Amino acid sequence: MSLATTLFAPWWRPQWVRQMLADLIAEELRRLRPGGPAPHFDLPSTVSNEAEPGADADLDVVLGLGSIELLDIATSVCVRFGLHRHGLDRRLLKERRLRVWAETVVEARRLDDSDLSFFSSGATGEPRRCVHPMSALVREGMHWAAQLADRRRVLRAVPCHHIYGFLFGVMLPARLGIPVLDVRAAPPPDVLARAEPGDLIVGHPGFFSVAAADADAALADAVWAVTSTGQCPDFVWGALTDLGLERMLEVYGTTECAGIGNRWAAADPFTLLPWWVVEPGRERLLRADADACVAADRWVWVDGRRFRVLGRLAGAVQVAGENVFPGRVRDVLVSHPAVADATVRPYGTGIALRLKAFVVPADPDADAAALRLELIPWLAERLRPAERPRRIDIGPALPQTPAGKPGDW
C-alpha cells in the first residue's frame, strides 16, 4: 500500500485507534488479572470519521498498572501495530496516556502499513500471533463495504481489536463514512429495540440468541445484522426473521484466515469469498498474498465454491462465541492440591454449549460439596468466563465405558 493511501486510510484516525486500544488493553488486563473488574475508559460510545477523539485517559489512574503489567500490555500493542519496527515502543512506557498511545499507533501506521497482527487461541489454547497483509484486509473490507453500502449506522456488540470486530466495527464504517455505536453495555433486547432503519447490528450467535429470546417488540424497518465467531443456529435466524430483521449476513472465518465464506440464509451453504482458491484435496485454501489457510473445521463440499461446516477439527469447542480447550481447563483443575485427577467435556448443543468437569479428590474422604465450593472461586481466578465449568461432579474414579475407555457422565 502506498504512503498516500496510508495517510488517508480513515480507520487509522485516532478516534478509531482509541477504541481498538481500549478493547485490547481491557482484554490484556483480564488475562493478567483473572476474575478482576474490567477497566472503564471514558470514551465516546459513538465514533465516526468526523468525531473528536474524545476524553483522554491516564492509564496509571484508570488501570493502576504495575511495571510488569505495563510492559506486558505495551508489548502487545507494539507487536500488534508494529511500533517496535521504528523505535516507537519506548514512547508507550514514558507516556502512559491513551491519547499518546493512539497517536503513536497512527504514526507507526504512516511509516509502515504493510501488515497487521491479531491473536488467536490456536490449537493449544495459548495466544498465537496471526499476521495479515494489510492489502488483504483492505480487499476484504472493500468487499463488505460493497455488500453493505446502504447501511447508515453500525451497532457494535463485539470488541474491535479482534479481526471480526476490526473488519466490521472499524474498517467497514470508516470506509462507508458512517457512525458506530458501541452497544455492549446494553442488554441485547434493548439493542434490537433501539435499532433504526438502515442500521447494521454486528454481533455473534450468543448475542442474537439472547436478543431474540427476550425481545418484546418488532424491529424497525430495514435493519440488517451480521454474525460471526460460530455458526448461528437455525432457530436464531428464524426468531430474528419473525421480529422483522430484513437481512442477516453470516461470515465464516478464523483469526488465521480472516473471512473465508458467507451466507445470507440459514438453509444455504457458505460460499467462498472470491479471492480464495481451493487446493487439490480441498484440505487447504490458498490466496495469492498469504500462506495457505488450513481449515479448523470439518467441511463437506456442495460444489467447487460452496461448503457446509460440520464441526471442529482441533480440540477447541465454541462456548459463548469463544474457542475454549477442555484439555487446558483440565490442566488447571489438576493443579489444585485437592484434585488427584479430572476430565473436562462439553455438554449442551449450539449456543447453549458449556463445559462440565468430573473431579477425583486427592483425599478419598473429602466432602464433595465443600470441594466443589472451594473450586468455583479458585477456577474463576484462573480461567476466562467461557472456560469455567458450569457443572463440577465429584467421584472416586473418572467415568469409563464398559470397554475401559474414557466415558461420559
Sequence positions of predicted segments:
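Thiotemplate assembly-line natural product biosynthesis machinery
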Residues: 2-50, 73-76, 116, 150
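Phosphopantetheinylated carrier protein domains
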Residues: 61-94
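Conserved pre-ATP/AMP-binding loop-to-beta segment of ANL
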Residues: 105-119, 149-153, 245
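Conserved AMP-binding A3 loop
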Residues: 115-142
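Conserved AMP-binding/adenylation subdomain of ANL enzymes
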Residues: 139-153, 161-199
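Gly/Ser/Thr-rich phosphate-binding loop
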Residues: 213-267
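AMP-binding/adenylate-forming catalytic core of the ANL superfamily
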Residues: 298-387
